[in-house]
Amino acid sequence: MIKKASLLTACSVTAFSAWAQDTSPDTLVVTANRFEQPRSTVLAPTTVVTRQDIDRWQSTSVNDVLRRLPGVDITQNGGSGQLSSIFIRGTNASHVLVLIDGVRLNLAGVSGSADLSQFPIALVQRVEYIRGPRSAVYGSDAIGGVVNIITTRDEPGTEISAGWGSNSYQNYDVSTQQQLGDKTRVTLLGDYAHTHGYDVVAYGNTGTQAQTDNDGFLSKTLYGALEHNFTDAWSGFVRGYGYDNRTNYDAYYSPGSPLLDTRKLYSQSWDAGLRYNGELIKSQLITSYSHSKDYNYDPHFGRYDSSATLDEMKQYTVQWANNVIVGHGSIGAGVDWQKQTTTPGTGYVENGYDQRNTGIYLTGLQQVGDFTFEGAARSDDNSQFGRHGTWQTSAGWEFIEGYRFIASYGTSYKAPNLGQLYGFYGNPNLDPEKSKQWEGAFEGLTAGVNWRISGYRNDVSDLIDYDDHTLKYYNEGKARIKGVEATANFDTGPLTHTVSYDYVDARNAITDTPLLRRAKQQVKYQLDWQLYDFDWGITYQYLGTRYDKDYSSYPYQTVKMGGVSLWDLAVAYPVTSHLTVRGKIANLFDKDYETVYGYQTAGREYTLSGSYTF
């Protein structure tokens, strides 16, 4: 619903309901400009997913949550735990900034992209998702968009849950949040998930030498947080989490050589912070440490054998963010410091290296009559490539009450990672990848339908690629991406509808060929209703045609992959006020399709789960 909001409570910006699972226009978000503001005041397209949405969808992975959102295209080398990539609005998987509680996710390896198949869904309490450039706020990576996974629970209580499903899937979870006195609360969580999986390789596509076995996944997770309010304005927190994952994947036989077909990932993160929440001024200081160890090995020889590979990364972060209400809006400023360190002898970096980055930024939001203005600028000083600046600006005009036009422009960049710089095939002279983006949008509320339609263009230069002849990474590539995004949500009686359409033309700007693994069109539809205390949900997704490479041939051949329509059906029933049982059929019509050429998807899957809260 569109309505006016007062300045001090809602930044004095006209409230428009963007496409989101939480359709309240006054939902507060922190990701867009690094300070708390109503979602309706953010000019960039923004989606919020709550834990209630995740439970209603009965999602068993983060990828299953994200695939439902506008502009997102997920590819995966098979089922649970297998290597996955997130493409937002046609940009590379490495052009998506993933934050955990506002802190950059630690990424080991040479790809520089987040593999969220490994991140436990049990930790996800909320997702804030911003589309478009955000490097002027966050620095490197935020070319296609920002995904902020928030682990903090909103309400006290205890929940015990269990689930079972196809391919011997099982999941057990216990979480609790308790008050210790009036000013302190503690949160604890433990989770175990396992599936035997299935054989992910489609033999007709990848030849006859593939390994024939089930490719399973095992994940064990622990989480703890302590929060304390010193006064009404001052508060602090300490939190930590870790997960221990094992993934079996398909490898190819080479006589006399170990068969590396098992991945073992250890990850731990620790954060501590101090917050000041005044009437006009807000400030937050956060320090963070994370450490990940990613092994690939033959289980007959073990992960410490000379044939095994190891990607190990330590990341240290300090963030100081401030926000002041000024006039009919606010101004934010802050400093980020980050250090990433590799361990000598990892799979990609023979010697130990570190990379430091210090960024300073300024953000602003202001309303003048029927106009809303938003801007940000940032300067990063990197130990490898020196100083790099980015900026963005947006303007919104409510030309008729309830209808708004938005125009925006922004620059962004992706820094080369340590593997690309110093790995066996690294190039220390690499420059950052750079992006220039334009977007225009109309949004409004018409006959009960909350809608938005956007058109955008993104020109990316200095793309980093690998040269088969020099065996080095280099800057040369260019991409040109054009797209249209339309979203809407509305109710018809007891039925709630959420729909989105994406058209993405992502091309190599030099050869004019389509970029791989991006669907040209996507349609996503969610229908929810309640009947006789049963909560029903139907999910539909159309994935359009896309292109990929057949790596089993030489030279590699480009292949065209057809589109597919997918349906999910979910139902939940509250047996009592404490006990809820749920059931789901994914891929209802058992469609046979691939998102990565040569790797088959699971087909129809069933899950049954229950949760008890007290």
UniProtKB/Swiss-Prot annotation:
> What NCBIfam families has UniProt attached to this entry?
PRK10641.1, TonB-B12
Identify the main location.
membrane
Q: Which residues form the TBDR beta-barrel domain?
A: 155-614
Span(s) of short sequence motif TonB box: 26-33
Keywords tagged on the record: Calcium, Cell outer membrane, Ion transport, Membrane, Metal-binding, Porin, Signal, TonB box, Transmembrane, Transmembrane beta strand, Transport
This molecule's function is given as: Involved in the active translocation of vitamin B12 (cyanocobalamin) across the outer membrane to the periplasmic space. It derives its energy for transport by interacting with the trans-periplasmic membrane protein TonB.
Organism from which the protein derives:
Escherichia coli O9:H4 (strain HS)
Q: Which Pfam family, any one, appears in the UniProt record?
A: Plug
Which PANTHER family does this chain map to? COLICIN I RECEPTOR-RELATED (PTHR30069:SF53), TONB-DEPENDENT OUTER MEMBRANE RECEPTOR (PTHR30069)
Q: Indicate what this protein is called per its UniProt record.
A: Vitamin B12 transporter BtuB
As recorded in Swiss-Prot or TrEMBL, the protein's gene is named btuB
The membrane topology term of the UniProt record is: Multi-pass membrane protein
Tell me a GO biological process for this protein: monoatomic ion transport
Residues passing through the membrane, by range: 158-165, 169-178, 184-195, 217-227, 232-248, 263-277, 279-296, 309-325, 328-337, 353-369, 371-381, 385-400, 403-417, 434-443, 449-458, 473-490, 494-509, 517-529, 535-550, 558-572, 585-596, 602-614
Quote the subcellular location field of this record: Cell outer membrane
| Binding-site positions, Ca(2+) 1 | 199, 211, 213, 215, 250
Give binding positions for Ca(2+) 2.
Answer: 213, 215, 249-250, 261
MF terms in GO: ABC-type vitamin B12 transporter activity; metal ion binding; porin activity
CDD domains assigned: ligand_gated_channel (cd01347)
